[in-house]
Regions:
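ATP-dependent carboxylate/acyl-activation modules
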Residues: 1-100, 106-109, 118-133
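Histidine/acidic-residue-rich catalytic or RNA/ligand-binding cores of hydrolases
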Residues: 113
Length: 133
């Protein structure tokens, strides 16, 4: 994971600074649409601006298809935003790029990445044996 694309609806803009700061501190480069990027920049977090789909190429969908985006956080409202978001989310799914549609989902991803060393992977059979199932 190295590049996080963030584009949020107006009602989520008050929460985006904290979220982008967390991802930046985890080593992510932040890429955002113009409106979201302006909020992020106000908090001294480096951010690269990318075009929305309706603004012409190259845009965020091109970046996802080219393997330039590793994580998508995309909340939307309004007709054009929902249209743009559907192509972003569909492309993320097709390209196997993790996509969350809520700020809370983004916070959960941060938490998992931050605490990844505390997680272990076990076979289901091992858990069954331990629990006597």
């Amino acid at each position: 994971w190295r590049v996080c694309f963030i584009s949020v609806r107006h009602s989520d803009r008050g929460l985006v600074s904290e979220l982008s700061k967390e991802f930046y501190e985890l080593g992510f480069e932040i890429v955002a649409t113009r409106g979201t990027a302006e909020i992020i920049k106000q908090n001294n977090i480096p951010v690269k601006v990318v075009k929305k789909v309706a603004q012409g190429r190259p845009h965020v969908v091109d970046m996802i298809k080219n393997g330039e985006i590793d994580l998508v956080i995309n909340t939307s409202e309004g007709r054009q935003s929902i249209i743009d978001s559907s192509s972003i989310r569909r492309t993320a799914l097709e390209e196997k790029v993790y996509c969350t549609t809520t700020i809370e989902g983004g916070k959960a991803v941060c938490s998992v990445i931050r605490n990844k060393d505390y997680w272990t992977v076990e076979k289901l059979q091992t858990l069954h044996d331990r629990l006597n199932i």
